[in-house]
């Protein structure tokens, strides 16, 4: 994107309140015009003094303009500040909402810390641009437009010096922006690397402390910061050179203007007041050119930050759902996979040709070795990804034709990592349903076997669980997650390794709550511990993205295939168990 496109898009965020922007812009135009009158008034005063005329009327007008200028400037600055702060807050909230509503696949692709860093830095950059636009950029542009013809009307010869100075400023600015474009982009990349390293290290501080990696991480950060400074310093050097050249050019230009003015006065072609007024114009023009140079520096620095932000917003818009999707309502829980296939970009992994059917209220266990595609299958069910081939039907409706919000409303998930927020226990349970009453929250906790340990804590339901639930035990965190799913009361339940991180005793307590939660719900269980799949109506064994075996627990145990081999390897299937299962199957057949 060009600098003009970047700047214009940044100003587009102000269009939410066009009337307010127009009022501030109009006031800026008036202030710019008043600023041009001051050198003229000063010149008139000097002429009056040199000609022994009356100066009081001119001084009175000048004083009135000055007082108006001060009051108007304060009001404009106050209005611009308040409006810029309000827009920053609104854009931050809008962008945050847009980012968190994106599919998980979008977050996996971009990285959470990268999106967060891009968002925060861009919002601050936008705020600075808005503030400077309403305070200086517009008034500078108006002043330059008015100054040039006014100066030409006073004296063409001295004006040509100022025009040459303006051309020189523009040339220096363009040269420096061209020289620093790649460097500024590199600076932004290094900022992202520093932020990502800090976020990653702090998020995993327990692991780093355990392995005595704190010194190494700090040293790595110092290396990243050094690389950042190494990239930043050449950019700063170029702008320092630009400022020095601009200062030198403006000083020489003022000397030339004064020399020309002195010559014209001595030859009777201009009055002293005219020269003084023109030098006032020259000083004003130079200050505006300095502001223009600062603006060029600011927009050049903002380019890399805002380009990333615009890409983020555009990708979020591209990932947004199309119009016309229906809501999934009155779900009974009948789920069918029809020849479903999906492949991850760059890895070739995924699932292929998956077909099975789950009746409403049944439990299906998806098992298999690591990397078999179990979690991918569940992600496809929840439309984290969309199938590249085949389709997934819920109550006969293709999930790609319904809104993600209504689909998620129909599915409750209990993850291996409970995923608790650093808030109270009540707030964490309320994630399941925001409008739930306290009675409903307590009932969900009772159903999840969590009520006793919650009430045993000094803060009860107001107890803050800490970051990622760090103040609770593993079993307590899982029961809070189960209570959340109970409160959601969705017709489809997903248990994603929900008990694999628990010890046997804690797992038994949590399993009772899970069994209660599964009742009358279509349930998908992803499990490594095969003890958790005994009660499943259907077992789907996957390997390398394909369904290898499928059937009931007893059926697959007796088939002596991959599933039975896993059971035997885990000590869960022996000859006695085979005979018992065989008698059970024969009894059902009879």
UniProtKB/Swiss-Prot annotation:
| Xref: CDD domains | ABC_6TM_NdvA_beta-glucan_exporter_like (cd18562)
Q: Provide the catalytic activity annotation.
A: [(1->2)-beta-D-glucosyl](n)(in) + ATP + H2O = [(1->2)-beta-D-glucosyl](n)(out) + ADP + phosphate + H(+)
State the top-level EC class: translocase
Membrane topology type: Multi-pass membrane protein
Q: Where does ATP bind?
A: 368-375
UniProt domain ABC transmembrane type-1: residue ranges: 21-301
Where the protein is mainly located, per its record? membrane
Q: Give the matching SMART domains.
A: AAA
Pfam families found in the cross-reference section: ABC_membrane, ABC_tran
What's the superkingdom here?
Bacteria
Q: Which part of the chain is the ABC transporter domain?
A: 335-569
The record ties this protein, via SUPFAM superfamilies, to: ABC transporter transmembrane region, P-loop containing nucleoside triphosphate hydrolases
Q: Which is an annotated GO molecular function term of this record? A: ATP hydrolysis activity
Q: Which UniProt keywords apply?
A: ATP-binding, Cell inner membrane, Cell membrane, Membrane, Nucleotide-binding, Sugar transport, Translocase, Transmembrane, Transmembrane helix, Transport
Q: Where in the cell is it found?
A: Cell inner membrane
* Transmembrane regions listed in the UniProt entry: 22-42, 55-75, 136-156, 158-178, 248-268, 275-295
EC assignment: 7.5.2.3
Give the Gene3D superfamilies listed for this entry: ABC transporter type 1, transmembrane domain, P-loop containing nucleotide triphosphate hydrolases
Query: A Gene Ontology CC term for this entry?
Result: plasma membrane
Please give the family membership noted in the entry.
Belongs to the ABC transporter superfamily. Beta-(1-->2)glucan exporter (TC 3.A.1.108.1) family.
Quote the record's domain comment.
In NdvA the ATP-binding domain (NBD) and the transmembrane domain (TMD) are fused.
What is the protein's quaternary organization? Homodimer.
Any idea what job this protein has?
Answer: Involved in beta-(1-->2)glucan export. Transmembrane domains (TMD) form a pore in the inner membrane and the ATP-binding domain (NBD) is responsible for energy generation.
In Swiss-Prot or TrEMBL terms, this protein is called Beta-(1-->2)glucan export ATP-binding/permease protein NdvA
Q: Which gene encodes it?
A: ndvA
């Amino acid at each position: 994107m060009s600098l003009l496109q970047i700047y214009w898009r940044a100003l587009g965020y102000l269009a939410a309140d066009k009337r307010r922007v127009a009022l501030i812009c109009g006031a800026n135009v008036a202030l710019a015009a008043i600023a041009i009158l001051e050198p003229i008034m000063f010149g008139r005063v000097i002429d009056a003094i040199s000609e022994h005329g009356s100066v009081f009327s001119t001084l009175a007008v000048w004083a009135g303009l000055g007082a108006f200028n001060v009051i108007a400037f304060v009001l404009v600055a106050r209005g611009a500040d308040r409006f810029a702060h309000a827009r920053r807050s609104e854009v931050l909230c809008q962008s945050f909402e847009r980012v968190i509503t994106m599919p998980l696949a979008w977050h996996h692709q971009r990285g959470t810390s990268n999106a967060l860093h891009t968002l925060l830095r861009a919002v601050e950059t936008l705020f600075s641009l808005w503030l400077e636009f309403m305070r200086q950029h517009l008034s500078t542009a108006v002043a330059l437009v008015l100054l040039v013809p006014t100066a030409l009307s006073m004296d063409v010869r001295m004006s040509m010096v100022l025009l040459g100075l303006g051309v020189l400023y523009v040339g220096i600015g363009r040269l420096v922006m061209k020289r620093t474009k790649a460097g500024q982009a590199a600076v932004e990349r290094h900022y992202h690397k520093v932020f990502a390293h800090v976020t990653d290290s702090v998020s995993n501080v327990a692991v780093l402390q355990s392995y005595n990696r704190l010194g190494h991480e700090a040293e790595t950060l110092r290396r990243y910061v050094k690389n950042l400074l190494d990239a930043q310093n050449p950019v700063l050097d170029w702008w320092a050179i630009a400022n020095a050249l601009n200062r030198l050019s403006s000083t020489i230009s003022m000397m030339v203007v004064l020399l020309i003015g002195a010559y014209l006065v001595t030859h009777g072609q201009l009055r002293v007041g005219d020269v003084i007024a023109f030098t006032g114009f020259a000083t004003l023009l130079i200050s505006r050119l300095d502001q223009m140079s600062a603006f060029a520096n600011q927009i050049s620095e903002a380019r890399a930050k805002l380009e990333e932000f615009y890409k983020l917003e555009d990708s979020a818009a591209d990932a947004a759902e199309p119009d016309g999707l229906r809501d999934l309502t009155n779900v009974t829980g009948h789920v069918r996979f029809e020849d479903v296939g999906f492949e991850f970009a760059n890895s070739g992994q995924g699932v292929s040709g998956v077909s099975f059917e789950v009746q409403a209220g049944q439990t299906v266990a998806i098992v298999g070795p690591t990397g078999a595609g179990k979690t991918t299958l569940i992600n496809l069910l929840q439309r984290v990804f969309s199938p590249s081939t085949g389709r997934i039907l819920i109550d006969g409706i293709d999930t790609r034709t319904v809104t993600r919000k209504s689909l998620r409303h129909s599915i409750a998930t209990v993850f291996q990592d409970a995923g608790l927020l650093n808030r109270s226990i009540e707030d964490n349970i309320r994630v399941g349903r925001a409008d739930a009453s306290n009675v409903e929250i307590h009932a969900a906790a009772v159903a999840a076997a969590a009520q006793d340990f919650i009430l045993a804590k000094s803060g009860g339901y107001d107890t803050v669980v800490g970051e990622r639930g760090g103040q609770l035990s593993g079993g307590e965190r899982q029961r809070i997650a189960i209570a959340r799913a109970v409160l959601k009361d969705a017709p489809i339940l997903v248990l994603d390794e929900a008990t694999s991180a628990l010890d046997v005793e804690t797992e038994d307590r949590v399993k009772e709550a899970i069994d209660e939660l599964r009742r009358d719900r279509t349930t998908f269980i992803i499990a490594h511990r095969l003890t958790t799949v005994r009660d499943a109506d259907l077992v789907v064994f996957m390997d390398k993205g394909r369904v290898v075996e499928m059937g009931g627990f007893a059926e697959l145990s007796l088939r002596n295939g991959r599933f039975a081999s896993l059971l035997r390897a885990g000590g869960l299937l022996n000859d006695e168990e085979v005979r018992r299962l065989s008698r059970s199957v024969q009894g059902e057949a009879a």
